[in-house]
Structures are given as C-alpha cells and as structure tokens.
Amino acid sequence: AQGSIIRDLQNADMVLLGGDGKHKGNLINIYKKIQYGYKEPSIHLMSTKAAEITKIAVNCFLTTKISYANMIGQVLAQSNLYDEIETVLSSIGSDSRIGHKYMNFGFGFGGPCFPRDNRAFASYAQKVGVEHNIGTTTDNFNKAHLLFLKDYFINDNSDDLPFWFDYIAYKPGTDILTESQQYQLCLEFLDLGYKVYVSDDLLKDKCDARILFGVPDEKVYRIDL
C-alpha cells in the first residue's frame, strides 16, 4: 500500500505467484531466495490469469467492507444515532468472522489502487457474464457516500464555521490526492463559499491554495501543528 510499501513487502500475509507452463513451479523457489522479510507469508501458486483475478478480488473485498461499514454508519446517522456509530461497528467487528479491520465509518476509499481495482473487477465480471456484480454497486455507493458526508457536515454546521481537515490525501501517511474524498470534499466546501483549514504535514509544501484548490490563498488556511 502507498506509504508503507517496503514494510508491507517485508511483512506480507500472502504472496501470489502467477505463471503458465511447466516451469511455473520454479517461481516459488525463486521467490524464497529473494524473500528477506521478517514474516513468513503463505505462498499461492496459480495461473497468470487466476493471480490477476485474485489480486483485484482481494482489493474489491476490502472496498466492499469499507462501503458496508459506511452504509451502516449512514443508517445510524439517519436514525439520530451518530454518536453510537463507532460502538456499533466495533461490536460488529468483534465477530471473528468479520474482524475489526476496515470496519470504520468515515471517508470512502480512494487512492490509485482501490477504485481502479474495484472497477476493473466489476468490468471483468460483467465481461464474462456476471451481471449485477457487487463491484459496480460498491463503486456507486462510494461516490454517493461523498455526497452524504457533504450534506451531513453542512447540515451539522449551522453556524457556517470553517471546516478543518487534518489530512487531505486519500489516507494518512501519503501525499497522494488521487480520488481522495477528503480533497474532493474540500473542493465542494470551497465551491460553496466556506473557508477550509488544512493540517497535512506531507502536503504542506504543496499546499498552495491556487494550485490545489483553484481559489485565492485567503480561502484556505494551512495549519502547522
């Protein structure tokens, strides 16, 4: 993942090796010679196409889980139970079949990988004849979730106070703005005339309001903590 690529490589849960032909079994021996991490991953050998499908299917499972957690959060918010969202999701994640990872309410998924893989899997599923696939639904919900957050935060801001973002990259620890819902929400608020405060150490050198947001500098305030 962006922001932790080396650490993730050294501590992978699994390694997918895809190959075709009678010598593909050699891939495992080759990998073991170069594997230098601190954790012994499970290694899975399969055809090239199966490995490609597996890779994007893993990310699609995560995007679906993110979207499902956000949907639960929306249901609770609409039920006047916003303060209990974290408690409910934590309770659901306590079930060992589900787990706590990605069971959080907040911004939808973004970045260069999740949206791309989600759409690729949805497109491929449709191509091979799987209709009404979850990938398409997840992608549509993720886009709609941004609008939900915008409306919710505006309705909750009756005093028209400035909005604060502690980061605007698609996730903490990177400076990547690709499909970042935080960044998109900043643009939405600025377009509506709100002031925005941004505190993002990794983006502070890039935080020129005219470049990032297309607005005068006095509309966006960079906060150094």
Feature names for model-found ranges:
Residues 1-225:
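Structural/interface elements that position substrates and couple domains in central-metabolism enzymes
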